[in-house]
Amino acid sequence: MTRQRVPALVIAFDTTAQAIAAETLFTAQGLPGRMIPIPSQISAGCGLAWKAAPEQRQALLSALDAAGAAYAVCQTVLLLR
C-alpha cells in the first residue's frame, strides 16, 4: 500500500521558545494541530513546526497575531498522511 501525500499547513519557528509559546497558545485556545519536526521542504531555525489542516490557517495566524507571537514561515506543503 502506498502512503498518500496530503496538504498540511505548517507554521515554523526560529526558536524553540517561539514554538513552545505557540503550542501553549494554540492548546489554551483549543485550536487544532500538533507540533512536528520541521519538514524538509521548509528551512527555518529551530527544527519545530505546528501542523494543522490548511483550512485552519486564518484561525492559527489570527491567534499568533493577537498574542504578538512570532513565527518564521507559514505555508501549505504535501506531507505523508
What do the predicted segments below correspond to?
Residues 1-7, 78-81:
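Short, low-complexity, intrinsically disordered N-terminal peptides in bacterial proteins
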Residues 54-81:
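C-terminal structural segments of small proteins and small subunits
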Residues 4, 28, 69-70:
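A generic structural signal for short, non-catalytic loop/turn and secondary-structure boundary residues
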Residues 7-62:
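Amphipathic, hydrophobic secondary-structure cores in small proteins
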